[in-house]
């Protein structure tokens, strides 16, 4: 649910990544090919894609209705608003082990979520796919995962288009624009997405 250097996991109840039309210029085609070759070797494993994203409480609607030919004007605040982050994993069309947290993610904090929230949510052998963020210490994560029969596979660098959870983050941000004013707590607004969409 919500964590500020503490863990409180929320469990929710395929399919695989669909490539977008844009890529980073830094992307290395050879590394992408290597990643896809490795992924194919885990054809009998459940695919688990994980990622983190951030949300600012300051969200506003960029569009509004008006009479034809009239411009809609609105004032927006220049103040800084609360920022929260979300880490979760996606299995097929479901998100699992979502956790909202404050402050920066660290290796130790991520590993605690990975061990205490994600791994217990996996009910069959899985290949866990994630990017190469600094706090993703692959050696530590592999050791924890392999003890339970799972594998860890890093995405090719600069290749978010191969992680389908990226599209979910965009969906959540659109959802928040419509419901944020209904909630006193920012974290409650974020977690309400799982209540209405994923259960």
For each feature predicted by the language model, list its residue ranges.
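Short functional hotspots at interaction and active-site rims
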Residues: 1-199
């Amino acid at each position: 649910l919500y964590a500020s250097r503490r863990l409180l996991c929320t469990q929710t109840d395929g399919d695989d990544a669909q490539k977008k039309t844009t890529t980073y210029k830094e992307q290395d085609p050879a590394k992408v090919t290597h990643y896809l070759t490795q992924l194919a070797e885990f054809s009998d494993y459940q695919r688990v894609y994980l990622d983190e994203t951030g949300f600012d409480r300051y969200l506003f609607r960029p569009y509004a209705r008006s009479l034809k030919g009239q411009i809609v004007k609105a004032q927006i605040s220049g103040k800084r608003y609360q920022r929260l982050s979300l880490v979760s994993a996606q299995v097929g069309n479901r998100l699992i082990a979502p956790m909202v947290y404050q402050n920066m993610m660290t290796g130790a904090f991520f590993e605690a979520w990975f061990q205490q929230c994600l791994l217990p949510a996996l009910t069959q052998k899985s290949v866990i796919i994630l990017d190469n963020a600094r706090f993703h210490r692959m050696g530590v994560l592999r050791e924890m995962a392999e003890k339970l029969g799972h594998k860890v596979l890093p995405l090719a660098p600069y290749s978010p288009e191969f992680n389908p959870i990226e599209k979910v983050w965009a969906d959540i941000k659109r959802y928040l624009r419509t419901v944020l004013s209904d909630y006193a707590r920012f974290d409650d607004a974020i977690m309400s997405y799982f209540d209405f969409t994923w259960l």
